[in-house]
């Protein structure tokens, strides 16, 4: 059984709500990933060997940045599922790539990561693609 979805032709309040859910999901994904990175930076480089898997996993799970990052990521997933209940997956999914656009800037600002020409061009292409799909 196929759930009723709002198509781009049926834009209105329902579509605005769905897009809001998608954008909250994207933002939660970015914030969650940033917190995961902060937590892992505090832990340092890890190796997942058979003998250390459980202890390393426990250290990650009890790291407050990792824990909160995962919680925010999970909350974003709830908003994503709410969006999927309202719109076609083929319409919603490209919006998830907006996280790449936001992440490029956030990683540069928070972690002093370099923005190479290739990353910049790729991010612009993603942004243009999302714009085109949002207009369909």
Where on the chain are the PLM-derived regions?
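Polytopic alpha-helical membrane proteins, predominantly small-molecule transporters/carriers
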Residues: 2-136
